[in-house]
């Protein structure tokens, strides 16, 4: 039962990094296929996966294609209920889903102003007020998650999909030397 995961370069593609972490960190069997995000071949590379048009995309062992990170997350959690993709405790699971949904649709200033990259640190970057507001929201959500955390360094104690979804935020915090609390810095250090 091996999945086929279609992603771009995880060094620069936050969505590809999330897709990869969803399988890799939970030891789910997969083959990674690289999509040419930056080489002009993306449309052709994605054509066999239609109607999926963005990364990550996942093909199940049965041949079904899943596009969009949240759909992939829910499908994997449903198919592997004992893998611990979501927190076991119901209230923590509710919060984890909420955080992932907000991650997918939010933080536009942070995304736009600090493109995800794992290749270097821009120590001289000066964040805008909008980026600082996004960072404040991230810290609020992380504190909200930790209220339901059991023992462990991750957002909900044990590693979960919420950590996979926020890993690129940690990459941005580290890569642009963004101003966050000591607790947020510690979480990012654990994540990276």
Short names for language-model regions:
Residues 1-128:
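GST-like domain detector, emphasizing the conserved glutathione-binding G-site
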Residues 107-192:
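GST-like fold's C-terminal all-alpha helical module
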């Amino acid at each position: 039962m091996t999945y086929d995961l279609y992603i771009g370069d995880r060094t620069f593609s936050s969505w590809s990094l999330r897709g990869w972490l969803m399988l890799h960190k939970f030891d789910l069997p997969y083959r990674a296929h690289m999509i040419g995000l930056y080489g002009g071949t993306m449309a052709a590379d994605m054509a066999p996966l239609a109607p999926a048009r963005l990364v990550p995309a996942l093909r199940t062992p049965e041949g079904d294609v899943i596009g969009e990170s949240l759909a992939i997350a829910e499908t994997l959690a449903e198919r592997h209920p004992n893998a611990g993709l979501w927190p076991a405790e119901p209230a923590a699971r509710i919060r984890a889903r909420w955080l992932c949904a907000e991650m997918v649709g939010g933080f536009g200033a942070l995304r736009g102003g600090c493109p995800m990259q794992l290749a270097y640190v821009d120590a001289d970057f000066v964040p805008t007020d909008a980026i600082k507001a996004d960072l404040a929201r991230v810290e609020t959500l992380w504190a909200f998650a930790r209220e339901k955390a059991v023992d462990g360094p991750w957002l909900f104690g044990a590693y979960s999909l919420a950590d996979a979804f926020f890993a690129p935020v940690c990459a941005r915090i580290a890569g642009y030397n963004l101003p966050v609390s000591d607790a947020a810095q510690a979480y990012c250090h654990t994540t990276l």
